[in-house]
């Protein structure tokens, strides 16, 4: 087994995954990225430029592809995987009545089932580098309190938080850490997308119109580093996430009233 620690990151072709890859690469780790976007992965890894990198094209919805990807990455990294970052995800906004069955299935399959498949595939590798190895799941502030106009997305992120808590307990005796990141709106290319097939409005425009904070993606990467090396189960990223968590815990009635008063689906 090699001496250099190794991290494999899904959704590594852009956004949060790219930022995490860059930070860990700068700090001497062997970095692997998985994505369906080959060009994006190449751009991510070219910026690291130390030769200790690997890219693997695959779809997180394919359970068998997970095994192939992690086996190939471990081979490239000298036989070890210390961290698997379950980061691949897609947005979905709009009222539930407007979301197509295809949109709902795709969001659940990528955001939740993909995370569970990744956890299942990662465990044998993380056991080998325990204690201290880590499964890092990207959840969301939408998994802290249900987000109006993003019910399906919110449900998937609640699922990711729940899976993180369950696996943290299940794997504790194995020495494998399980952590989640709960960011608010992050400055990534996803904000340029429309929230669903019925809308032409970019998510970024909707966020700005609501007066909400957009957090630099580099802050998420630093939070990922802290989560992997720390004891906090859920790491909140950005003021929106922290305020929502505080309100949901200490002022749930007020948060509920505000959610009702400001309810407007992202796609409208």
Which ranges hold each PLM region?
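Conserved glycine-rich cofactor-binding loop
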Residues: 13-14
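The beta1-alpha1 cofactor-binding region of Rossmann-like NAD(H)/NADP(H)-dependent oxidoreductases
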Residues: 38-39, 57-68, 101
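Substrate-binding pocket helix/loop in short-chain dehydrogenase/reductase
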Residues: 95-96, 100-108
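Active-site helix of classical SDR
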Residues: 119, 156
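Residue(s) in the substrate-gating loop at a strand-loop-helix junction
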Residues: 140
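Active-site-adjacent segment of SDR/Rossmann-fold oxidoreductases
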Residues: 145, 166-177
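SDR active-site lid
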Residues: 173-239
């Amino acid at each position: 087994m090699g001496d250099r620690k190794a991290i494999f990151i899904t959704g590594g072709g852009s956004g949060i995954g790219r930022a995490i890859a860059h930070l860990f690469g700068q700090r001497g780790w062997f970095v692997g990225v998985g994505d369906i976007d080959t060009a994006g992965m190449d751009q991510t890894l070219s910026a690291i430029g130390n030769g200790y990198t690997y890219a693997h094209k695959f779809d997180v919805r394919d359970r068998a592809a997970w095994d192939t990807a992690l086996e190939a990455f471990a081979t490239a990294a000298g036989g070890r995987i210390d961290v698997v970052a379950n980061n691949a995800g897609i947005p979905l906004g709009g009222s539930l009545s407007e979301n197509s069955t295809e949109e709902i299935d795709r969001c659940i399959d990528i955001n939740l089932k993909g995370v569970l498949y990744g956890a299942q595939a990662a465990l044998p590798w993380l056991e080998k580098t325990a204690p201290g190895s880590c499964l890092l799941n990207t959840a969301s502030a939408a998994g802290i309190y249900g987000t109006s106009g993003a019910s399906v997305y919110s449900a998937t992120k609640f699922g990711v938080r729940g899976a993180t808590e369950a696996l943290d307990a299940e794997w504790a005796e194995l020495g494998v850490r399980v952590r989640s990141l709960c960011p608010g709106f992050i400055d990534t290319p996803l904000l340029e997308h429309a929230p669903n097939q019925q809308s032409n409005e970019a998510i970024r425009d909707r966020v700005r119109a609501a007066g909400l904070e957009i957090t630099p993606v580099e802050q998420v990467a630093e939070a990922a580093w802290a989560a992997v090396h720390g004891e906090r189960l859920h790491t909140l990223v950005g003021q929106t996430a922290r305020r929502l968590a505080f309100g949901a815990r200490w002022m749930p009635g007020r948060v509920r009233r505000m959610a009702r008063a400001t309810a407007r689906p992202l796609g409208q």
